[in-house]
Design a protein with these regions (language model features):
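Alpha-helix N-cap/loop-to-helix initiation residues
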Residues: 12-13, 132, 154
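Phosphate/diphosphate ligand-binding glycine-rich loop within oxidoreductases
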Residues: 2-115
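Glycine-rich adenosine-cofactor-binding loop
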Residues: 8, 100-105, 112, 116-144, ...
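Adenosine-cofactor binding site in Rossmann-like domains, unifying the SAM/SAH pocket
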Residues: 152-158
């Protein structure tokens, strides 16, 4: 049985495990989704070693940036954003290869692109949290100037 999972800390708020396990069952996919609540990103190595069936991981707070140093490769988008939320795990012989991606930018950009008209030149991004980096990248890829709105005073925000 293939395994997939989520790494982060804490994970009590996450609905991923029940969501994906229900999808696997409904689609007849022989797979399991597991939450790996790890207090340190250094625990990732132990998870990989003790779960050789792992094919992929979702990554949530606080590890979207910290996980990058554990990866063998990172997609250009995730590299530019500086955050990874999907890790593809490949096994080649005794070697485990970890590839990082950012699906936030793909989902956001594809969902907003049909609504962007030629007269749209600027966009406000509300917040400066993790997803805002992906949103900023997506908006810029569509040719829009961006401004961040934050509740905290930071350079480059209003």
């Amino acid at each position: 049985m293939d395994k997939y999972g989520l790494i982060g800390y804490p994970l009590g708020h996450s609905f991923s495990k029940s969501y994906f396990n229900e999808k696997f069952e409904n689609e007849g996919i022989n797979a399991e989704y597991i939450n790996f609540e790890i207090p340190s990103i250094g625990d990732l190595t132990e998870i990989l070693d003790s779960n050789p069936e792992l094919k992929g991981l979702n990554v949530t707070i606080p590890y979207k940036e910290k996980v990058i140093s554990y990866l063998d490769s990172v997609s250009p988008e995730a590299n530019a954003i500086g955050a990874v939320n999907v890790v593809k795990i490949e096994h080649k012989g005794d070697e485990t290869i970890l590839k990082g991606y950012n699906s936030d930018v793909i989902g956001f950009t594809q969902s907003i692109e049909p609504f962007v008209e030629s007269y749209h030149k600027k966009a406000l991004i509300l917040g400066t949290g993790g997803a805002s980096k992906a949103i900023n990248y997506g908006l810029k890829s569509l040719g829009l100037e961006t401004v961040f709105v934050s509740r905290y005073e930071r350079p480059g925000t209003i």
